[in-house]
């Protein structure tokens, strides 16, 4: 059952729901209206995020062939067209209701629901109090990666603090913490490549598209520019250590799925045997790499700005 599910449905929630519906029909029959409400919300979500990328990355890269020469041309497409002020309270409450419904199906519980009746089936509903809104749909800018890096890394750090404060929470929050940190690191590597490295737009898009989720590929893409911006042997030594850490993560999770799902696309567990790890140490490991990459981005941005200012000043003489 699992392999056909993955290959037919991937991340598409509507397809997944329709695939499993025959197996949870008894639970659905207990409150079919709640099921139909949830399904309608998934249908509204699907055009926005059927590939599960819209909230992980700031944009996607589209490829088309030049009609005359047949060459591939790369363009950036935003996930959200037009600015929207999202009602975060309504969004969070809808998600909580959906989780409750799905958990009852998973646990074979036959329950009825009332809370969903307070909400419509619009996925990203606008409105609400001013301080309870999130604005999405900004035009692409050079600093577009920054807020996503901050959001993922600070969320991971928050879960890490919960684990340290209460060891009973390790089983619950360890993998989410690792996934959030891993995605933050991927965003940081892509930010350095796309915003600071000395390549043209088409080349940056092409290599970014091919790198997918591989830390090794992303690191190799930025390494030459990073060394060029580094200052002295001390910096190069730090870069060497950072490279070892980054390649360790890549060896464990090159596809960004090990911390995201318990099994791979063939239904096999990522970790077959029990492993005892130091959760605090793992959190600090991720955090230090994240801070290193953020410093790299700031250093390269500062250098590039200085070079641009010098070039502009030099051009004034001619």
Model-derived segments and spans:
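Domain-scale activation on soluble regions of proteins
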Residues: 2-318
């Amino acid at each position: 059952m699992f392999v056909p599910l993955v290959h037919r449905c991937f991340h598409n929630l509507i397809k997944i729901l329709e695939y499993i519906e025959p197996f949870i029909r008894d639970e659905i029959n207990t409150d079919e209206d709640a099921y139909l409400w949830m399904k309608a919300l998934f249908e509204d979500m699907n055009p926005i995020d059927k590939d599960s990328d819209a909230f992980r990355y700031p944009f996607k890269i589209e490829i088309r062939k030049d009609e005359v020469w047949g060459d591939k041309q790369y363009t950036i497409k935003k996930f959200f067209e037009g600015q929207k002020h999202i009602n975060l309270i309504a969004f969070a409450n809808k998600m909580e209701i959906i989780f409750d419904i799905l958990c009852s199906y998973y646990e074979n519980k036959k329950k009825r629901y009332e809370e969903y009746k307070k909400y419509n089936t619009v996925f990203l509903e606008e409105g609400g109090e001013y301080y309870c809104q999130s604005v999405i749909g900004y035009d692409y800018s050079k600093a577009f990666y920054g807020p996503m890096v901050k959001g993922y890394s600070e969320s991971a750090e928050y879960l890490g603090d919960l684990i340290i404060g209460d060891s009973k929470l390790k089983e619950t929050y360890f993998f989410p913490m690792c996934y959030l940190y891993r995605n933050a690191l991927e965003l940081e590597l892509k930010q350095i490549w796309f915003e600071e490295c000395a390549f043209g737009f088409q080349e940056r898009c092409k290599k970014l598209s091919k790198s997918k989720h591989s830390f090794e590929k992303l690191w190799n893409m930025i390494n030459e520019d990073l060394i060029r911006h580094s200052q002295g042997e001390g910096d190069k030594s730090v870069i060497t250590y950072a490279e070892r850490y980054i390649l360790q993560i890549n060896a464990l999770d090159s596809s960004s799925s090990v911390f995201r799902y318990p099994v791979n696309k063939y239904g096999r567990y990522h970790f077959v045997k029990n492993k005892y790890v130091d959760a605090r140490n793992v959190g600090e490991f991720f955090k230090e790499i994240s801070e290193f990459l953020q410093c790299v981005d700031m250093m390269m941005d500062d250098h590039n700005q200085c070079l641009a200012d010098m070039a502009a000043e030099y051009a004034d003489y001619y």
